[in-house]
A protein has these predicted regions:
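A glycine/threonine-rich phosphate-anchoring loop and its flanking beta-alpha core
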Residues: 15-111
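Active-site segments that bind and position negatively charged phosphate/pyrophosphate groups
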Residues: 110-161
């Protein structure tokens, strides 16, 4: 199955793949900042149930993940801000140089969909590339040793309840 979406639709679709025949293959193409930076490296497919976050779920990796940051130009500003907040969390916990870039280019990154809107300055595009690569790299460093979340003391869980 091929899923080109982020958020709830992607999560529920991935959960369905994990449940159907206990492992239906899927390819994911995340389309939001959070999807590209965070969900793209995670194998957790959890859904909320009975007022509990991620109460139902599984750990099921895709056979491929395609990252196309061009999707960001299609997002409303509120979605860009949500992803920006996730990058602030990751960088403040794990990578100060990225945090400094986010601070320096904050408004320009939000106004230009992370440098992907028409007319974005090359400097902003370059900063966006560095930020996004660093965000993914840090997520991989933090997730890889604990893919199945056996250890609950996770830096990237900062702010989660």
């Amino acid at each position: 199955m091929l899923f080109a979406k982020s958020g709830t639709v992607l999560t529920i679709s991935r959960f369905a793949c994990a449940a159907y025949r206990r492992n239906t293959n899927f390819i994911r193409i995340p389309t939001t900042v959070i999807g590209l930076i965070d969900a793209s490296v995670s194998i957790k497919v959890g859904v909320n149930y009975a007022n509990y976050k991620n109460r139902l779920g599984a750990y099921h990796a895709p056979i491929h993940t395609f990252l196309d940051f061009g999707f960001l130009r299609t997002l409303p500003t509120a979605q860009i801000r949500n992803g920006f907040a996730e990058l602030i969390k990751i960088s403040s916990c794990a990578h100060l140089p990225t945090f400094d870039l986010l601070d320096k280019y904050a408004e320009k990154l939000i106004d230009t969909a992370f440098g992907h809107a028409d007319g974005a300055e090359q400097e902003v595009k370059d900063a966006s590339d560095r930020i996004n690569r660093a965000g993914i790299h840090e997520m991989l460093k933090l997730e890889t040793p604990n893919l199945h979340e056996i250890g609950l003391d996770r830096v990237i869980a900062y702010g989660h309840t």
